[in-house]
Amino acid sequence: MIADIHLTHLSYTQLDTMTWCATAQVRESLCLSFDTLWDKASWSRLSVFNIPPIAPNKFCALNWQYYTAPVTLSARKIAHNQRQLQRTGVRLLLQALISELEISDTLDESNFPYRLINNKYYVCFSHTGPNDKSLNSNVAVIISHHRSAGIDIENNNVAWKVAQRFYSDNEISAIQSLPTTQRDIIIKLLWQIKESFIKIRQYTLAQGLGMDYAYLITDLLDALRDPSPVVVIANRQSDYHIAFLPIQQTVVVY
């Protein structure tokens, strides 16, 4: 068996004349290798059942059914495999976005923030694990011609106790007054905004999560009522814009 990594549910969004993002689901499936099957086929066993040898040119035309033996992996191995899947997935998505934009370029990973070698566009990745027991992950990428940008895709909610540990006092006070359903969404959106700014500003995790974005909460609540596929919020305390893509569960700071 050969692992085949591919993207599904691709979505491309142009945020302005110099900024584009893409999201997708990355899947890993198993596919048959003709060479492996042919080399390992036990014709001696087939002869026991009076099954004649099969010519190579007819081998692939057969209606094959195959099964894989169940494999028990450690939690560490599963996490490693998922990280590898996500790493490959974001780079496949970058290539898809580059192709969509009709750009001929490759990624320079020698410094952060990442940039395209020829066009010098800024690149930022994000990925998130599944919110169920499947092995699928969601991935996201942003390309900005103007300046460094941040992106965060997140399937899972952020626990209230985690927010209480990292968020500012102003944020906690404002969040506590919200109904539970709104509270959970705002906690998650703030987390995604913080993650995006961490990628832009190169904050440490604790420093970035502790930044105070309480002034954005009213605008975020308004954004939740907006049915648009992309909702853009002007950040009053910087010249960055914040885009919320609800269907893709993605936040972009650009």
Mark where each language-model region is.
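Core catalytic alpha/beta fold that binds nucleotide/phospho-ligands
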Residues: M1-Y254
